Amino acid sequence: MPFSLGQRWISDTESELGLGTVVGVEGRMVTVLFPATGENRLFSRTEAPLTRVIYNPGDTVESHEEWKLTVTEVEEKDSLIIYHGTHSETGEQVSLRETLLNHNIRFNKPQDRLFAGQIDRLDRFNVRYQCQLLRNKLATSDLLGLQGPRVGLIPHQQWIAHEVGQRFAPRVLLADEVGLGKTIEAGLIIHQQLLTGRAERILVIVPDTLRHQWLVEMLRRFNLRFSVFDEDRCVEAYADHDNPFYTEQLVICSLDLLRKKRRLDQALDADWDLMVVDEAHHLEWSEEAPSRAYQIVEALSEEIPGVLLLTATPDQLGHQSHFARLRLLDPDRFYDYEAFLKEEDSYKDVATAADALASGEILSDESIAGLTQLLAEKDISASITLIQDDAADADSRFQARDELLQDLLDRHGTGRVLYRNSRASVKGFPVRNLHVHPQKMPEQYVTAYRVSSMMNKHLDTNAKVRQVLSPEKIYQDFDSGSAAWWKFDPRVDWLIDFLKNNRSKKVLIIASQAETALSLEEALRTREGIQATVFHEGMSIIERDKAGAYFAQESGGAQALICSEIGSEGRNFQFASNLVLFDLPLNPDLLEQRIGRLDRIGQKNDVEIHLPFLANTAQERLMQWYHQGLNAFECTCPSGHILFNEFSGELLESLLNNDEAVLESLLDGTKARYQELKVAMEQGRDKLLEINSHGGERANQLVKTLADKDEDTQLIGSVIRLWDIIGVEQEDSGENAIVLHPSEHMMFPTYPGLPEDGITVTFDREMALSRDDIALITQEHPLVQTGLDLITSSETGTTSVAVLKNKALPAGTIFLELIYLADASAPKSSQLYRYLPPTPIRVLLDKNGNNLSDNVTYESFNKQLSAVNRHIASKLVNASQAILHPLFAKAESFATTQLETLTECAREKMTSQLSGELERLKALKAVNPNIRDEELSHLSEQMAELNRYLDSSQLQLDAIRLVLVSHA
């Protein structure tokens, strides 16, 4: 290369150094100073990775004094370039020597990089284009946020997430029965809200015992990095901000932290977009005295636009508290408890009509009359005629039924606020089998009972019942807490024998008290050396997690996990199928929560429930009431709380007094009332709610679409090529898994999300679900998203030169391929990307400026191209400059026409979708008060805002490829 002092060159490998100046030429070496950074580089004269910077007429250049010149003539004198042209501010004719060019010049624009000789490899151009297409495809997907999480494709979960996650500031109560996956539903909604930009700051409030579990679940299943906040974390955060909650976007904390006024005030001031409250059945409310927990959540719900409340047992604290939770979501709608009860009574007619439609049978005259009355504001005669016509197309009849069903659900009930799936409507649950193991009452307990009944006559009935249900507690209190009751309790003997006979099986043991759980662990360890671990409220979160992990460990792990009552809230152990209830809780909902730790979707075996109890005691009578009265062991009992409230007086009396006649009367009365409630619930509001909550055929179709996306082999190829280009080491580990490692030769110094010690990934959902240590890769995974961002936000692949070997074309024929992006800058929260995301526009010109892109596809053209080395590529560009400059203007004209078309299509799509939804909601609001005013005003504002953004849409040249025909 001919070098002379003062010439300007740019580094091909370190373009961030800016414009360099030759300051030394000695022998075989050349020294270049890069004034922008103050660094010198020494290069070999024959192999220097440098490109000479020479501008052309029409270009604008900047002097070191920051004035600009539009070049009209380029003169070379003594191996240096002098630019002649027009001063941009004064209009005068001026000259500028290349030594006086601005040092900070960056060749960021594709055309600048092309003419400066900064030409990328052919495969990088291709990967960049594929990345832009992939980003566009992801942004326009109606299922954005649903595919990425590592969860099973379960219809009702995906349906609820799809329905709720697309709303602006959703405010809903997720109340699926135990085991149906409320946490997953909430995670899917959170994931959607974040990916779509509808939410950025999220506060999750959970019981103290579940903080770490939520942290792990959000990361492992949803790739969301939450931070757990406690008092210590808040104190540490003061170093960064006066309000600790502003130091993180995604926060998990407990209600206990927010009981402190200072922390609550800070949380209220933290500008959250979405609040999630788990175990919301603990929020007790009465009109006269709402609980402190309720008041905290109420204050936050008044400040935070989006609210998700999670509970498996809506009525655990009574129907009033259930109403109060709905009141948190929409106080204007749920303003009066008595009015709410009257409205619930009216749901029966709606459910009857919905049943008639859902059955698929010919509608009776009574059903038609009911539907006509319920949908009086709409003419449904054509739909009814179609449904009743046996000769009509089956799909058309189904669609007519479905539309009327949706009209019913839209106009009546709490369908937009409350989602509750029952096991009756969801498939995939195991059989539950009860095994009772009566044991003889030991004399030690008989004595302790006798003494306790004499000494504790002052106790109220509830306290007395709790005592007789836990004889070991009475005995310990009786003997000053030092006695080892487990040495003589026959239930412990049975438990040891059971574990010894089932050594290969994992067993979950639940007892009411932490002291009981600890004593059982001691008994198993000291008497038989059985490996067991304990889980109780006195342990730290990390200790509980370790206990859970030790139990889950297949090889060398604990055979048994012994939980106190907290073990039946929030923790799931469906890898085990044997449950031992060492005692029974005095609450049907708590019993269901215990069983629900194993009886969940994903449980592959029947759940075996073992109940050792002391015969002829309160334990046996409570077992009989649960089993014979409620059938609560082998089936879920949605009416359990109602029955407990109605029969609690008789039940408590029966537990305290061993009277067979009282027990028989109690069991008969409970069974009869249970059947009544079962029939009433079938006929009433719950059935309507189920139809809306599980999604029916629509949910099945949604899951099928997601499953089809999982099989997209094109995505797999694109992602593998992306990692190849970046320089990620990929090692096949068999079983559809790949181990990724950062390499020393990666294109970028860091790859966020790729650990130093590597990560194992798979594109197979089933494998990812079966292996916690393997990440599921979809187009939504952070490793893919980050990889796309690394490529598209850098200069990688913005220029390329290739050769087309085709003897049917004259040698030397030129083609210019340009990739533009149609873009309208807008905040993510505006949802503009749904209508006009950055969209690649391809223009392929011949030397005469004809656009061939409609006739020559990218794929067919790309397959015929061959790479050329960089030195030859630079020469080809320089030789073609006179032809190329006019082509750029023509290409932009073609692209502008396409931009206008895209913008108008986006506007039509936006107007059609949003105005249609707005009109639908306005019509519904007249008959269903669950439609919030905020939703209507948000849609109107969003339409106006999107129109403004679309008006400012523009083109951006993203990449250029020069192609020359060769016969060589």
UniProtKB/Swiss-Prot annotation:
Motif (DEAH box): 278-281
UniProt entry tagged with the keyword DNA-binding: yes
Pfam families attached to this UniProt entry: Helicase_C (PF00271), RapA_C (PF12137), SNF2-rel_dom (PF00176), Tudor_1_RapA (PF18339), Tudor_RapA (PF18337)
Keywords assigned: Activator, ATP-binding, DNA-binding, Helicase, Hydrolase, Nucleotide-binding, Transcription, Transcription regulation
GO MF terms, alphabetically ordered: ATP binding; DNA binding; helicase activity; hydrolase activity, acting on acid anhydrides
Database matches in PROSITE patterns: HELICASE_ATP_BIND_1, HELICASE_CTER
CDD domains referenced in this protein's UniProt entry, alphabetically: DEXDc_RapA, SF2_C_SNF
Domain Helicase C-terminal: 491-678
InterPro entries listed in its UniProt record: Helicase_ATP-bd, Helicase_C-like, Helicase_RapA, P-loop_NTPase, RapA_C, SNF2-like_sf, SNF2/RAD54-like_C, SNF2_N
Domain Helicase ATP-binding positions: 163-332
Binding-site residues for ATP, renumbered to this chain: D176, E177, V178, G179, L180, G181, K182, T183
SUPFAM superfamilies according to UniProt: P-loop containing nucleoside triphosphate hydrolases (SSF52540)
Subunit relationships: Interacts with the RNAP. Has a higher affinity for the core RNAP than for the holoenzyme. Its ATPase activity is stimulated by binding to RNAP.
Record-given protein name: RNA polymerase-associated protein RapA
Taxonomic lineage from the root: Bacteria, Pseudomonadati, Pseudomonadota, Gammaproteobacteria, Alteromonadales
Gene name of the encoded protein: rapA
